[in-house]
Structure formats: structure tokens, C-alpha cells
From Swiss-Prot:
Keywords: Membrane, Transmembrane, Transmembrane helix. It is a multi-pass membrane protein. GO terms for cellular component: membrane. This is Uncharacterized protein YCR024C-B.
Length: 88
């Protein structure tokens, strides 16, 4: 298991399994139609690196936004870290 994140936040992460993804909320924040959004970078922790960028609205329930197949669990340490677990 590899747990490598921003060193400042490593004390949050002793429980992350090998299939976890980390979301780093970047410093980029912007507003569209009076709604605030963060730019989020996703980094896969195991095996090859996987990187993508996505947008989600603040204060919206992220589980209802992402979990349509009920295979995704989201744990959020807002505004620092959000962890997404993909269950097979």
C-alpha cells in the first residue's frame, strides 16, 4: 500500500487501502452563475498513476453526485482532502 499525499496531510491517511483515490482540492476556485466550484485533481495511489480533472459544486452532496451505481464511497475532509473508494 502506498500512501503518498501532500506531506502536511499525511496524518489523515493511515487507513487508506490500496484501491483508494485521493482528491486534492486545488487553490483554483471559480464562480459560475453565482455558484462556487473547485477544480479537483484525482491521483490513483496504486500501480500506475491515473490523473484526471473534474469539477464539483461546493456544498452539494458529493455521494449523490457520483454514486449512481452504489459502488463509490466518498469521505471528505473539507476543504483539504476528499477520498473516493471504488468498490468492485
Amino acid at each position: 500500500m502506498c500512501v503518498c499525499a501532500i506531506p502536511f496531510f499525511e496524518f489523515f491517511l493511515p487507513f487508506i487501502p490500496h484501491y483508494a483515490f485521493l482528491l486534492f482540492v486545488s487553490s483554483v476556485r471559480f464562480t459560475v452563475n453565482e455558484r462556487c466550484y473547485y477544480l479537483v485533481c484525482v491521483l490513483k495511489l496504486n500501480c500506475a498513476f491515473f490523473f484526471m480533472v473534474m469539477i464539483f459544486e461546493l456544498k452539494r452532496v458529493c455521494v449523490s453526485y457520483l454514486d449512481r451505481s452504489r459502488k463509490i464511497q466518498i469521505v471528505s475532509f473539507f476543504p483539504f482532502i476528499t477520498i473516493i473508494f471504488f468498490h468492485s
